[in-house]
Amino acid sequence: DKSLGSMAQIQNQLLDHIDILPENVHTFPGDLPKETIFTFCEEYEKAIEAAGGIDIQVLGIGQCGNIAVNEPGTQPNSSTRLVIMDSNSRMDAKSLFGHATQVPTCAITLGIDTILQAKEVILLAFGQHKASIVKQAIEEVANAACPASYLQLHKNASFVIDLEAAGKLTRINHPWKVTNCEWTDQLVRRAVVWLCEQTKKPILKLTNKDYNDFGLSELITKYDSAYNCNIKVFNDLQHTITGWPGGKPNADDTNRPERANPF
């Protein structure tokens, strides 16, 4: 059904609004006879090469790190081909087809090698639900378990992501590991709680050595000692605990208002 799928979305949201001739749109037909698909894929690769290669490749990223329909396990030398879609990819595509039962079991996709030969690659990811896989793609060693991680091998690849999708990246979640920080009260609390998790110690048991061993020596400099930093964070957290509203039903709480932003 030509009204469904990713190409229909591209047509409705992009191609119908720009001045591009239909003959300059090269897509993968969904009705190719099975016996012609291999030849079609070979010819598609030749057409890309004849056109001078792909100038800009724009991608999304699936929940398992797939780019295009290159599922986990795809090798970096893969080219345009027919693939069987796994259950995760079919769920990702559900919104394009209206219902999971409408999603095809197979698809033609550009291969990893084809994508990496593009002059520029841009990957888009938005939302908190993409945070874990974005971190894996950017910060872990490139590997077949996360095909998007192969973009680390490209000389001109960019990830365009919002703050929610970037939320688990070290530079966002634990910035003290990679740069000097502007130590706001909230960031100090987050760093000290993280240090407690790493050392398996309560706040008031943290030592100067703990701070130094885990890259938080800046806080020792800022507060002169682990003791001072510990006390500050302990008191900050303690003051976020409130019993308000409390007391008897209909009791007058006029003289003990709660802060709008206790944390």
Put a short name on every predicted segment:
Residues A251-P262:
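N-terminal low-complexity segments that are often proline-rich with Ser/Thr-Pro
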Residues K2-H26, D31-P249, D253:
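Conserved phosphate- and dinucleotide-binding cores of soluble alpha/beta proteins
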